Each structure stands twice: as C-alpha cells, then as structure tokens.
Amino acid sequence: MAQNKIEKSEEDWKSVLTPEQYHVLRQKGTERPFSGNLYYNKEKGIYTCAACGQELFSSDTKFESGTGWPSFYDVISSDRVRLHEDNSYFMKRIEVVCSRCGSHLGHVFEDGPEPTGQRYCINSVSLGFTKEEDTGKEKE
C-alpha cells in the first residue's frame, strides 16, 4: 500500500533536494544517459523515491536496457506510481510519477522484457537505494 501523500511547497522541495534532483523530480527534467550512479548498481535491494522515500522498484525487476537509465520491468505495487500522458517534445510517452509526492521519475514504454513487456525508464537521480541486508529482508 502506498504511504500517506506528501505535499510541500516548491521552496520546501528546493531546500531538501540537490539542484539536479529538483530539476528532474520537480521540473520534469531528464539527466544525461549513463551519468547516474544507480544505472550501474548491481546490488540486491529496493529502489525508493529520492524525494519522499516511498519504495518503488525491486532490484529483482531491474534489467539492462542499454538506454543509459535504470530500467525495471515492474513496480513493487501499482499504487506506488501514477501514469500520465506526456506529449512534450513532439513525442507521445507515458510519464511515471511517485504516487506519494508527485515527483517525476521517468517514463514507461511497451518494449520491455517478459513477464510484463514494460520498461520503466527511470532517472537515477530520482531514486534512492536500500541494500537488501539493510531492509531486513535477506533471503535464506
């Protein structure tokens, strides 16, 4: 279940996010491909919203798409994100935003692997990461 909704003023967001995070998360920017640390992350764990900490993606659904952004074929739960039509830059895309704080995460495309066929293409700067051993959910 999604966590309680968070609402902050843009000034409050500016005070808690880095300039790059603010640009991507709050102004719907896009980081340069292959520039984010989490693109290269191979550790087991949970990817969270960098703005509010809501759990979004499991490392079990991360895959190498070759696009330069972390890619996942599914979300932890469908109530963790909201999808919006995005027709900016003369393209038809589906924007992915955090359902808890409304921050821009990236886009979802229909060219991903099985079992969903989806590719959640997410800005690395939009994400936090908690290693599996830190979550207390280690597999036996």
From Swiss-Prot:
Cofactor: Zn(2+)
Pfam families: SelR
InterPro entries: Met_Sox_Rdtase_MsrB, Met_Sox_Rdtase_MsrB_dom, Mss4-like_sf
GO molecular function, one term: zinc ion binding
Annotated GO biological process: protein repair; response to oxidative stress
Lineage top rank: taxon: Archaea
Cofactor binding summary note: Binds 1 zinc ion per subunit. The zinc ion is important for the structural integrity of the protein.
Reactions accelerated catalytically: L-methionyl-[protein] + [thioredoxin]-disulfide + H2O = L-methionyl-(R)-S-oxide-[protein] + [thioredoxin]-dithiol
Family of this protein: Belongs to the MsrB Met sulfoxide reductase family.
Protein name per UniProt: Peptide methionine sulfoxide reductase MsrB
Species: Methanosarcina mazei (strain ATCC BAA-159 / DSM 3647 / Goe1 / Go1 / JCM 11833 / OCM 88) (Methanosarcina frisia)
Gene: msrB
